[in-house]
Amino acid sequence: MGLKGYSVGEGGGEIVEVQGGHIIRATGRKDRHSKVFTSKGPRDRRVRLSAHTAIQFYDVQDRLGYDRPSKAVDWLIKKAKTAIDKLELGETTTTTTRQEPVNTKPESPTLVFQRENNDQTQFVAANLDPEDAMKTFFPATTTTNGGGGTNINFQNYPHQDDNNMVSRTTTPPPNLSQDLGLSLHPFQGNNNTVVVPETNNFTTTHFDTFGRISGWNHHDLTMTSSSSSEHQQQEQEERSNGGFMVNHHPHHHHHQPSMMTLLNSQQQQVFLGGQQQQQQRGTLQSSLFPHSFRSWDHHQTTSDHHHHQNQASSMFASSSQYGSHGMMMMQGLSFPNTTRLLHGEEATQPNSSSSPPNSHL
């Protein structure tokens, strides 16, 4: 241990290099003002102890028989060397950092289904296939039976009434998203009333499926498609008997035959009643179908009404199968001899006025 003298301040002094640091020993001044160099900078040589610690230290010094406190401190440090070394080792161990092994294995996507208090939360992985992602929207419990089969039970979905369920086989066009129906309006300048009452709602569902019907048989009544010539002949016969007919444009007769609107039993009494001899002249307009509507005079005696009411009611009986309003619209069909069943073949009274010409919407 060497000594090197340096002048420190005006009073001078020297720095004594000792084990564990340096001691600044002041010269020309009292020793209590000396400082020591430590790892955290110069500190006072003298250590101020609390009263309780000073009592215990002097008790140790007295037991050791030392006359100087520094000797008692050296003995304590020597006895505590093992503990001090452990503290130094402990400091080195605490400073060392342990690196945890990094798991580079990619995790497989997981699906979590949770349902609490009727609130369902689903977590779907972003890297799923479209088919797998579709399955995640339906929480299912899969059970395997003894035969190797798999049973999938769908749960936690509200059940709707079967009566309110409507099967949609085809997607309707955007302009037919509402309920389909015929809106009958008299032509401008015509003050005559409409035969059909306003309280009846002509609505129907699944209009697109009517075009697929190829034939319709009801009891002894058989209806098949006819040619264009037969259709024109039928129109002339219907004009003499009266009724309502919904037709396509004439140049489409060879492609699309006529379509007839069947009314329910309540509308039959108004339509076939001989007491209400109401006339409808003009053009019936429709806001949904590009068809031309014809109207002609309706004259029927009470005797003819009672004579042919049974035959007409048998044909209209099936209209209750297609809704509460009893309306059935058949496309792609022609109904030969229909007006004969409605008004009878022996109607002999001539019409008071001729039918108006066809008008296209």
UniProtKB/Swiss-Prot annotation:
Mostly detected in lateral organs, such as leaves and flowers. Expressed in cotyledons, particularly in the vascular region, in leaves, roots, stems, buds, flowers and immature siliques. Residues 295-304 have a biased composition (Basic and acidic residues). It is found in: Nucleus. The gene is TCP10. The keyword Transcription regulation applies. GO terms for molecular function: DNA binding; DNA-binding transcription factor activity. GO terms for cellular component: nucleus. It comes from Arabidopsis thaliana. InterPro entries: TF_TCP_subgr, Transcription_factor_TCP. Transmembrane segments: none annotated. Residues 220-259, 295-317 are annotated as: Disordered. Plays a pivotal role in the control of morphogenesis of shoot organs by negatively regulating the expression of boundary-specific genes such as CUC genes, probably through the induction of miRNA (e.g. miR164). Participates in ovule development. This is Transcription factor TCP10. The lineage of its organism: Eukaryota, Viridiplantae, Streptophyta, Embryophyta, Tracheophyta. Residues 29-87 form the TCP domain. One of its GO terms (biological process) is leaf senescence. Interacts with AHP1, AHP2 and AHP3. Interacts with SPL. Keywords: Developmental protein, DNA-binding, Nucleus, Transcription, Transcription regulation. Signal peptide: none annotated.
